[in-house]
Amino acid sequence: MNTAPFIAIEGPIGAGKTTLATMLSQKFGFPMINEIVEDNPYLDKFYDNIKEWSFQLEMFFLCHRYKQLEDTSDHFLKKGQPVIADYHIYKNVIFAERTLSPHQLEKYKKIYHLLTDDLPKPNFIIYIKASLPTLLHRIEKRGRPFEKKIETSYLEQLISDYEVAIKQLQEADPELTVLTVDGDSKDFVLNKSDFERIAAHVKELIV
């Protein structure tokens, strides 16, 4: 069990997870864990051929996130220091279930549980829920070359997958707090009041 608040920002590709996590980290002075996306050597290949490279991609992410969370537990959470992350480790399962073959998925889930069962889990999730047009606009705006290859149908599937996953996480942990942010109507970057409403919920958690 965590000895300190562990906050995860989640949502589909382009929802604004890292942006919001960074803003909250700066406001409250929390250490931040952010996933290393562009350093994944399989990412560009993955969007060229999802079937061929999905297992390698997901294993890279899993191992990298495992190390991050292990270090975070030792250096911060066990010492009572709140932490914010721009992902929940369960996102590995969300993406793996979407892209891996049944045979690969069976192997992957065994490794996933072996690595993550004793890792700290977030006790507060901020879920940024956004529609396809919003995600496409934000993906285009940030201009990552490999994301230009993302198919619209893949994003649509992820939107649905995230809805299911958030419900699963809540059912698995009744004490988990989930704050859903409407990413279509709320602009926490340009509208200070939208950000402050989110920050107020975080403040309630840590006082």
From Swiss-Prot:
<dbReference type="Pfam" id="PF01712">
    <property type="entry name" value="dNK"/>
</dbReference>
<feature type="binding site">
    <location>
        <position position="47"/>
    </location>
    <ligand>
        <name>substrate</name>
    </ligand>
</feature>
<keyword id="KW-0067">ATP-binding</keyword>
<comment type="subunit">
    <text>Homodimer.</text>
</comment>
<feature type="binding site">
    <location>
        <begin position="11"/>
        <end position="19"/>
    </location>
    <ligand>
        <name>ATP</name>
    </ligand>
</feature>
<keyword id="KW-0418">Kinase</keyword>
<dbReference type="GO" id="GO:0005524">
    <property type="term" value="F:ATP binding"/>
</dbReference>
<keyword id="KW-0547">Nucleotide-binding</keyword>
<comment type="similarity">
    <text>Belongs to the DCK/DGK family.</text>
</comment>
<keyword id="KW-0808">Transferase</keyword>
<dbReference type="GO" id="GO:0019136">
    <property type="term" value="F:deoxynucleoside kinase activity"/>
</dbReference>
<feature type="binding site">
    <location>
        <position position="35"/>
    </location>
    <ligand>
        <name>substrate</name>
    </ligand>
</feature>
<feature type="binding site">
    <location>
        <position position="147"/>
    </location>
    <ligand>
        <name>substrate</name>
    </ligand>
</feature>
<dbReference type="InterPro" id="IPR031314">
    <property type="entry name" value="DNK_dom"/>
</dbReference>
<dbReference type="InterPro" id="IPR050566">
    <property type="entry name" value="Deoxyribonucleoside_kinase"/>
</dbReference>
<feature type="active site" description="Proton acceptor">
    <location>
        <position position="86"/>
    </location>
</feature>
<dbReference type="InterPro" id="IPR027417">
    <property type="entry name" value="P-loop_NTPase"/>
</dbReference>
<dbReference type="GO" id="GO:0005737">
    <property type="term" value="C:cytoplasm"/>
</dbReference>
<dbReference type="InterPro" id="IPR002624">
    <property type="entry name" value="DCK/DGK"/>
</dbReference>
<protein>
    <recommendedName>
        <fullName>Deoxyguanosine kinase</fullName>
        <ecNumber>2.7.1.113</ecNumber>
    </recommendedName>
</protein>
<dbReference type="GO" id="GO:0004138">
    <property type="term" value="F:deoxyguanosine kinase activity"/>
</dbReference>
<comment type="function">
    <text>Plays an essential role in generating the deoxyribonucleotide precursors dGTP for DNA metabolism. Highly specific toward deoxyguanosine (dGuo) and deoxyinosine (dIno). Only marginal activity is observed with guanosine. UTP is slightly more efficient as phosphate donor than CTP, ATP and GTP.</text>
</comment>
